[in-house]
Amino acid sequence: MDTKDFKRLEKMYSPRYLPGLDGLRAFAVIGIIIYHLNAQWLSGGFLGVDTFFVISGYLITSLLISEYYRTQKIDLLEFWKRRLKRLIPAVLFLICVVLTFTLIFKPELIIQMKRDAIAAIFYVSNWWYISQNVDYFNQFAIEPLKHLWSLAIEEQFYLLFPLVITFLLHRFKPRNIIQTLFIVSLISLGLMIVIHFITGDNSRVYFGTDTRLQTLLLGCILAFIWPPFALKKDISKKIVVSLDIIGISGFAVLMTLFFIVGDQDQWIYNGGFYIISFATLFIIAIAVHPSSLFAKFLSMKPLLIIGKRSYSLYLWHYPIIVFVNSYYVQGQIPVYVYIIEILLTALMAEISYRFIETPIRKKGFKAFAFLPKKKSQFARTVLVILLLIPSIIVLSGQFDALGKQHEAEKKEKKTEFKTTKKKVVKKDKQEDKQTANSKEDIKKSSPLLIGDSVMVDIGNVFTKKIPNAQIDGKVGRQLVDATPIVKSQYKDYAKKGQKVVVELGTNGAFTKDQLNELLDSFGKADIYLVSIRVPRDYEGRINKLIYEAAEKRSNVHLVDWYKASAGHPEYFAYDGIHLEYAGSKALTDLIVKTMETHATNKK
């Protein structure tokens, strides 16, 4: 290849800045931040991560094929070096700050934080959280580095994909490469569906590189079909209008999904992520076109400012929200706290972007130096050292003693409360009537209480109030899990005159049919159905089903915990679901009072 040919290829395949993608990044990161602030505000905001994945797949592949077409090779070492300078410094800065903050303000969490930090440093956070059975959608646990799972997937992709694409470009035509990538994306989709069907674990398929590769590969495929360097600026107005209609329509669909999709919706784990990501391809395709008015909309200055800092904003928003929220009861956080979290996120993101990421991206590690003439370099170096020293000591395990008691308490924490099964005594009709009409006999009765971790919380308090109660509470239990248990173990309670308390729904949504099946399994027993208080997007839907069941069924009585607990943050632990002693006592008293009221009304 002579110099003339090289210059022609250089001009033809030269990569260009794509401001429209920064604008799309802005919407994605805003959605993610709102979701983590309060999932009830934007239940599908977590889909912003998938938008990032598709963009990453598209951009990285575009850069790689552009380089290959220009030079007939891909400099892998240079590619990895650029990724290193772009991603790692900001993550290390974040981890050092989080470890230092934990050491000073949350020392009891130091062991957990050390383990999470090590996983984050080596970009294996997603597999680490899978191995620890971490629930991604449990926003109430103090896990400030949990959001780094997505960066782990991207870094794993950046490490391996260039090797694969280099091999494919040398041996196959673009059409064959597209077919190969499409098949692999379908395999990834199939793995998500199969693993989810077998395990029923949303977090396993959400965290897994194997099950999330589908989204990245769709972006890669688009880069071959619609490379940015091949798009012409001079096109007819009709084509421009058509492109904008496609872009705006796709964008409207994505934004709608941000509002209506929930993290417990099962369809998204059974092909939904693939469909949503496929729809995102149309937005990206128009966002990168040089003639699109929609691309110009995405290129507005405010969106570009946010989009260029989207990586920094993503890094910092989650630990700030987690740490600040840990001092409040979830679901009862004052509005000013959210404002503080947003401001802190913007501040730390700007510090990271301006003083860590940009200097290193431009100058490499020369941005750090002990040169008196360059105060910014000196200050930056001192700051990093001040954060690095305690972080290294934490990672070495020197402060583990501070967290050993907390780790022991976690292991000893009750995950189940179950009283010894009591024999259900059959009563004649006259005895049933007397029992129902006597408040005193409520405390001598033998009701069945079945529930989740909230039931575990009230177990000891309730048995002091009603010693003969049969209690079956288990952490993580969902309503659908309870129905087969009732049918196999508690058939004796499905009789008129028996009393049953049902407290379920904090761990996930259920349908009207599922609730009816559970209630039907108790026959004509008096059922006391407890409404839920859980700061999740499904709270209102579940309570509506509970209220409707209590209204329509003569044997179902409402225990309105949602109403009774309003304005009582002292009832709850940090997560806004589990109960402190005051809450356990209040819920116990409410259940007993509801039983007594029902007994009185039957006179």
From Swiss-Prot:
Keywords: Acyltransferase, Cell membrane, Membrane, Transferase, Transmembrane, Transmembrane helix. SUPFAM superfamilies: SGNH hydrolase. InterPro entries: Acyl_transf_3_dom, Acyltransferase_3, SGNH_hydro_sf. The active site is at S453, D575, H578. Its EC number is 2.3.1.-. It is a multi-pass membrane protein. It is found in: Cell membrane. The keyword Transmembrane helix applies. Coiled coil: none annotated. Gene3D superfamilies: SGNH hydrolase. Pfam families: Acyl_transf_3. One of its GO terms (biological process) is lipopolysaccharide biosynthetic process. It comes from the Bacteria. The keyword Chloroplast does not apply. The chain crosses the membrane at residues 17-37, 45-65, 87-107, 148-168, 177-197, 211-231, 239-259, 268-288, 311-331, 333-353, 382-402. GO terms for cellular component: plasma membrane. One of its GO terms (molecular function) is acyltransferase activity, transferring groups other than amino-acyl groups. Belongs to the acyltransferase 3 family. PANTHER family: ACETYLTRANSFERASE (PTHR23028), ACYL_TRANSF_3 DOMAIN-CONTAINING PROTEIN (PTHR23028:SF53). Responsible for O-acetylation at the C(6)-hydroxyl group of N-acetylmuramyl residues, forming the corresponding N,6-O-diacetylmuramic acid of the peptidoglycan. O-acetylation of the peptidoglycan is the major determinant for lysozyme resistance. This is O-acetyltransferase OatA.
